[in-house]
Amino acid sequence: MKDIELFAFDLDGTLLDTAPDFLFAVNELRDNYNYDEADYDQVRSRVSQGAASLASYALNLENESPQKVEFHRQELLEIYESCCLLSTVIFDGVEYVLNQLNNQKIKWGIVTNKPRKFAEGIVEDKLGAFKPPFLICPDDVGARKPDPDGLLLALEVSNSKPSKSIYIGDHIIDIQAGEKARMITGAAAYGYIPINDNVMSWNSNHVFNEAKDIISLIAK
C-alpha cells in the first residue's frame, strides 16, 4: 500500500519521546507530598493516557473523587509546563520519515490530545524544522480522541480522502479515532503502550515496531 496521501500522527509516544519530562514532573509532584521517586516504566506506560492517569499514579488517587484527581492533575500540569522542553526528544527514525514525506511532498500533520498551550511550543521547539503543515489539538474541535473530530478536521484542512489517509498512534484510542474517521490505522508499538496491553488486540491495519518502519508505506 503506497498510495497514501495523508500521514496523520499522534504526538506523545509517536513522534516525540516526552516521557522523561513527564517523569520529572511526576517526581516533583510526589516530592511535594513526601513520596519516593516514581517508577519510570509506570510513568511511561501512562503518558498516552493523559495527565489524570499520571496524577492518579503519582499520588495513589485511583479511589479518590474526580474533583481531587482534577485538582492534582492541574498541579501536575503546572509543573510540566515548566519542564516540558528539558529532555523531550524525537523518536529514533522519525526524522527520516518526516524528511521523506517532505521531500516527496506527501501531506502530513499532527492530531493530539495534548492541549495547545503545551503542544504548540513543544512542536515548534522539537519539530519546527520539519514545518508540520497542521497541528490539531482538543481546543480546536472541543473533543478528545477517541472522538474523531480532530481527524475529521485534519482530513478537511488537508483535502484528503479518509480511505487514502492513515492515522498513527500509540494508544487504542488513536486506533478507535482513526476507525471512526474511516481512515487507515497504524499502531506505534514503540510508544507508550499501557502495561498489560497488547498492541495486536487493537486490530489496527498496520503495526510499527520502530518509527522507521513507517517508511514502508511511503511511495518511492
Question: What spans do the regions from the language model cover?
Answer:
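Metal-dependent phosphoesterase signature
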Residues: 57-96
